[in-house]
Swiss-Prot record:
Domain PA14: 411-579
Protein function: Beta-glucosidases are one of a number of cellulolytic enzymes involved in the degradation of cellulosic biomass. Catalyzes the last step releasing glucose from the inhibitory cellobiose.
Active site: residue positions: D233
Lineage of the species this protein comes from: Eukaryota, Fungi, Dikarya, Ascomycota, Pezizomycotina
Species per Swiss-Prot/TrEMBL record: Aspergillus fumigatus (strain CBS 144.89 / FGSC A1163 / CEA10)
Catalysed conversion reaction: Hydrolysis of terminal, non-reducing beta-D-glucosyl residues with release of beta-D-glucose
Domain of life: Eukaryota
UniProt subcellular location: Secreted
GO biological process: cellulose catabolic process
Protein name: Probable beta-glucosidase J
EC top class named in words: hydrolase
Signal peptide per UniProt: none
PANTHER family: BETA-GLUCOSIDASE, BETA-GLUCOSIDASE J-RELATED
Enzyme Commission numbers on file: 3.2.1.21
Amino acid sequence: MGSIDTVGMGQRAIDQIISELSLNEKVALLSGVDAWHTFAIPRLGIPSIRTTDGPNGARGTRYFNGVPSACLPCGTALGATFDRDLIFSLGQLLAAECRAKGAHVLLGPTINIQRGPLGGRGFESFSEDPVLSGLAAASYCSGVQDGGVVPTLKHLVCNDQEHERVAVSALVTPRALREIYLLPFQLAIQGARPGAVMTSYNKVNGLHASENPGLIRDILRGEWGYEGAVISDWFGTYSVADAVNAGLDLEMPGPTRFRGPALMHALTSNKVSEKTLNERVRKVLELVQLASRAGVPEYAPERKLNRPEDRALLRRAAGESVVLLKNDKNDSTNSPILPLDREKTTLVIGPNADLAAYCGGGSASLLAYYTVTPRQGIADKCGAEQVVFSQGCYGHKELPLLGEHLRTIETGQPGYTFRVYTEPPPASGSFKGSDSRTPVDELHMTNSSAFLMDYSHPQISGDTYYATLEGTFEPPESGVYEFGLTVAGTGLLYIDGVLVVDNKTVQRAGTSFFGIGTVEERGERYLEAGKKHHVFVEFGTAPTSNLQHHHGVVSFGPGGLRLGGCRKLDTDTAIQQAVQSAAQADQVVVCVGLSGDWESEGFDRPHMDLPPGTEELVNAVLAVQPNAVIVVQSGTPVTMPWADKAKALLQAWYGGNEAGNGIADVLFGDVNPSAKLPLTFPRELSQNPSYLSYRSERGRVLYSEDIYVGYRYYDTTGQPPLFRFGHGLSYSTFHLRDLTVRETAPYAANIKESSLRVSVTVSNTSARPGAEVVLVYVRPPAAACSVGRPVRELKGYEKVMLQPGETREVSITIPLGLATSFWDEGCDAWLSEKGLYFVEAVGTGEGNTLVAPLTVQVSRVWNGL
């Protein structure tokens, strides 16, 4: 990579460079040159650096036809591990993946708060708790930085819903803003000093975050002393002078909308001073300097990594993220149902059994090196002859992608041929052989979801162009097949020359492609097994459509198309078949849940329910096989009306490349579960604290639950949820004793000199090695508090691995200010009030809780990190 001065470059070098930059060059540096790269100035040795999504894998520069990558478990899965060392190692892996993709800046982690269960991007973030989120983010960032890559904390702040995300104003009290939504950023910056922070799309109390001086200038840079770069979310800049003056350094992506000539005009009219401009330029140059540590060449080619040690780490992460929610006894053996016996035949049922639900949708999605389904993971462990499968029902929102099941006409390779044209198709239809157009590009592809945001070709200018998708489909069995076509643009699907889906003539707005696309339009056709059926799609990019976009969404240019298909299923018959098999089976695993179809950037879920047919399937199987193990995959809470009937229940999230192996490892005891819920699972949607005020209404969303987010609400109101925050069982048993709490410097005038040292003795009282997570909560003074406070709040945690019979002391150090303070709106600062607090150490299992008193001798006010 070209470099400013990668060896010993200091502040004076940057000062010198700024003095040599022309005004036009300074302005150019403050925006991207394309979707993923910053502006270069070769004459001064300033290179372009590359950014990449994030947060659970490094995609590289291409949504469209990209290079495969390693996919980590989703954010909530990582939060469930409560393992900072593991997350640090995964950060190191992400850095290596970034370098393989030629990237210097990773756009992750996401550390927004799941104030409710429906947020489309809820799966990306670690937890509903700000301390767990902030400490996990610090470990993530430290690991990424250890590999020389710059991590990016996102999204500052209150980007907690997708509905009207670029237009909505989050109305939040100063106290809730500080104690819940900003605290993860504060802790991550304190613990890791990441090189970049990304602003959110939304407004905060009436002002967009990317032009909000209170957030960027006063809190981030002023109070916290943050010295890194502040970059916009993609197309999340809304002004010229306001954003620059507030402290937004880099507008992304390019070409610019609000810098360039507009910023030059703001400079000449004194809307922006050159001093302020130089401050923004300095931060961009410092980002480039920091990025040079990666040793990645400028505009480096993208390549695969996929190392054996990475696959092992991903498998470990997948297994250690699985939460054991229930493990009751088998009535016939009087032993816990799990782990299962690999010598017995296992019946695997359900919509997620043969589906690789490895990641959520949107900017967190990527093309994985490989994926493992639960069925495959179980078969690989037990032997294929020991595993029987029954579908039960489908769980997809959109029909499964068809691309990998197609074959090219020319060579018979898996996939299809994608041809790009600058001219529209003939009126008679290009599939009839009357197409005289010459394609400007021809690609062989397997992924039939094609998002064209970053597709480019020298012969194409602008966003208007056309494409065809062509291949053959040979069905494994005869029957009626459903096909679905989703577009941000226009599309027609032909099977054997017959129009099966028209998504052009009349279109319906949907949530696809970040909210700018259509619903999936479907059609049916009877197909014969063993026959090659011709599949052809005519597509026009987004400008060819007259569809009106939803208000408050981000438009990503040319749009895209998605082609899906599968055999039509009679759900009642499929459930009946599954039930008949379950009644005779030795042991049964039912795999249900969501996928990236249901949880994605661009839209929120309308409800917490699992897909249609799922509840009926689970109830029917449990009626004949009460010992069936239920495995749920989702990134955020779902309703489980059958949970009281289920004796064995796992929450398995989106587990990345190794999702299926991680599930199988826990099911059969190769991994002893140690994960805990990082989110509260309510019994139903109306029980959650944000129920009455989640969506945008006339451009604003009221955070009416205030500081009582997640478990803070349930604990304070005494409402029992379905599963509590921090719940998670093990195949081992543990015992906590001898809790001690010691305060250092109890009378220090500066509370930052004071801390708590919480120590507890932990014993493994079982015959199986296992890991225990010790959660430390602090209860505020019951009578002496000057404001209402939650019953208890998480302030620290530690994970410890113990052999059978082993005993160890676990010590956790917590800053006293973090442990005892609330945000005092009267003095605009943190206040630690004197009084009698109680410290709780909580382990696995009912009643495994210890309590010790803590007396804070003096009240103290503080600010900053």
